[in-house]
Amino acid sequence: MFKLFTARQHDKIWDFDGGIHPPEMKLQSSTVPMRIAPLPDQLIIPLQQHLGPEGELRVRAGEQVLKGQPLTVGRGRTVPVHAPTSGMITAIAPHTTAHPSGLAELCVHITPDGEDRWREQQPWADYRQRDKMALLDRIHQAGIAGLGGAGFPTASKLQGGLNGIITLIINAAECEPYITADDRLMQEHADEVITGIHILRHLLQPQQVLIGIEDNKPEAIAALQRALRGQDDIHLRVVPTKYPSGGAKQLTKILTGKEVPFGKHSSSIGVLMQNVGTVVAIKRAVIDDEPLIERVVTLTGDALSSPGNFWARIGTPVLYLLKLAGFKPQNPPMVIMGGPLMGFTLPSLDVPIVKISNCILAPAETEMGLSEPEQSCIRCGLCVDACPAGLLPQQLYWFSRGEEHEKARNHNLFDCIECGACAYVCPSNIPLVQYYRQEKAEIRALDQESARAAEAKARFEAKQARLAREKLARELRHKQAAVKLTDADQQTVDAAVSRLTRQSDGSESVINIPAGQMPDNSAVIAAREARKAQARARQAEKQQARSTEETTDVVDPRQAAVAAAIARVKAKKAVQAQHVTTDVAEAGSEAMAEDPRKAAVAAAIARVKAKKAAQAINPD
């Protein structure tokens, strides 16, 4: 009894809130076998076909390329693109791409040579012997991005799930009307689907693997059951048809009963999901060494006489594919890329097929009905009942129209999956999804502007801090230079101090300054005063030398004779003074007598000078 209860719990499926049941419109393309689209005259490959920045070019105009040759470099979340066939690159220029804005993006234009020659391939039949990181790099370099519509880099998603993944879900629901690409892929390539699942199991090691498929695909269900025969590690879950059961959060709720929190991804609750088309691309990349250069595209609508699914090379113009399906242009022509609920009208039929192009819908005028004008919201609440994400579409609409960005963000605008269920049930014909997309774009633009402003402010503050540091360092260097002597200046100061010391006390002692000690201004002043003293000494020596030279010049004879006469007179007066002094002493006078010795000395000096003068006159 317990085992039966466990089995029923194991096979149980849940339901999600909201959702709608629009006409399916799948039979016109799902009952026809897939066809291979011939090569067009020119392929246009946009450099950015995934969620992330475009890669760096590896080729140039005029270069010959081979099928599968990478055209850009893949690093990080940048997924490379490859040449869909062999041929010549005729141009690398902007071209209109599959985007609602109709803006041109950089594209590589290739003219096929008709040979369809592959680059060298290295198949990995023994992928289980390969390292996990090698497998991830193989998937990344093959340029694989999510083929379900989001275009998230597959290798990055798998790398983030290497640890902590409990459940691996293969999304085969394909819930949007008209689209049958995955349906036909499972019918005709079920074995490749299962092989791709085994590769993912080897990488992620999940506890369980679930395939979720809607019950409106009986042929695909039968094909998968045949491919799974004898394998009990992969479980096929058939779920009721309801739009949008193919949404990641909605299918997670259906198969596991777990709800992904607001603002989170399914990996936060241990679930990782891959689209069935992505699984086939992984198998071909790992085992066959085939990069993502083609995909299945549904061509449908009443404007086509031969709708169906085509294997189309990436870069094939939309108009070329439409002609293969018997396109009958309407007046005015209307072509939608994607489904009727989540797709968008193409700005031009010259745009190329990209990796996320799963459907081209060419409806007739009667099929789409008349376009009714938008009216005011009547607050009926039908959009709230239909929303599968549990949001308040009416409030988000008012916030978007009023440009109340923070309120829209706080009401979880970015959890909107843009499924179009709210617009489908709106009686006022309000294109709610368009408002939400525009509001998201505006918020992202504001966030980018704020980020750029914050970066600019950080750069400015860093610059100001750097300038302040440089100013302080410069002032410190100037202060140090004012007191710090060079080696030559230090030697000069030491020499001056030594000379002053020797002059003052005659010693030979040297004043030593300890190593590393910063001299003060007194040393500089002492050196300056020493230099001044030296200059004064040299000046005095020069003056003394000049005086000596003047003294040693030729003596005037007349001056010598006069000097001799004066000397004799002084000597005579000295003798007379001696006699006068004697008389005065005898008379009892108190006057002081002159010292006879001084007089004798003076007389002797006078005689010597007279003799020298006579010799100067008569040297012989």
UniProtKB/Swiss-Prot annotation:
Main location: membrane
Known cofactor(s): [4Fe-4S] cluster
UniProt-listed Enzyme Commission number(s): 7.-.-.-
Keyword Cell inner membrane listed: yes
4Fe-4S ferredoxin-type domain boundaries: 366-397, 407-436
Subcellular location: Cell inner membrane
Enzyme kind, highest EC tier: translocase
Membrane association type: Peripheral membrane protein
Similarity remark: Belongs to the 4Fe4S bacterial-type ferredoxin family. RnfC subfamily.
The protein's name: Ion-translocating oxidoreductase complex subunit C
Taxonomy of the source species: Bacteria, Pseudomonadati, Pseudomonadota, Gammaproteobacteria, Enterobacterales
Gene that encodes it: rnfC
